Amino acid sequence: IFRQGVIIKMKKVLLLGGSLFQIPSIETAKKMGYHTIVCDYLPDNPGQHVADEFYSVSTTDKEAVLALARRLSIDGIVCYASDPAAPTAAYVAEQMGFPTSPYASVELLSNKDRFRDFLAKNNFHVPKAKGWAYEEFAQMMEEIHTFTFPVMVKPVDSSGSKGVKKIDDPGQLKAAVDAAMAYSRCKRFIIEEYVEKYGYQIAGDGFSVDGR
């Protein structure tokens, strides 16, 4: 940027993902005066046409994103509307000394089976749940009698309810697990006992500023 003959360096922000739902974050960053850089493995993502720069890098490949961030000397990294990319954003920020939630905490929150185990071990009220690798399907079938149906079958590392199914008997497990695997990068699934909601559900989004 040139102002009165003086070159002012714009700070660079790396945004993970360029889907339609992520365009508002790119536009907002540009309005705030940042040089916007988007990475996404999908070649037809619309965000690349909004950002100042685009690189074809998977947002879930944390080492590749870190290498890109270092090469471009970014000043910040943002993960917006993408749960799978959240661990990458935390990892890169941690490695580069940016303010961030701890990578270990974000990674734990992004894996349903590990998070359920954490909650249970810390005395939170949670439904009966257990995770298995896809190749452990036979072992799961030997243990499924300990669950009360109906149950939920989910990929451990997906979001937006993708690959999630409610089933009423063990005969439906194979199809449900196969459907979950289509949305799991690590090829793991979790089974949880179904909990019926009573009354109203209150939900919202939170954010922190300066650690508060």
Over which residues does each language-model region extend?
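Conserved ATP-binding module of the ATP-grasp superfamily
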Residues: 125-127, 150-153, 165-198
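Short acidic-glycine loop/turn motifs at beta-strand connectors
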Residues: 208-212
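A conserved helix-loop-beta module that forms one wall/lid of the active-site cleft
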Residues: 94-163, 170
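CheY-like receiver
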Residues: 68, 143, 176-179
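ATP-binding N-terminal substructure of ATP-dependent carboxylate-amine bond-forming enzymes
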Residues: 5-105
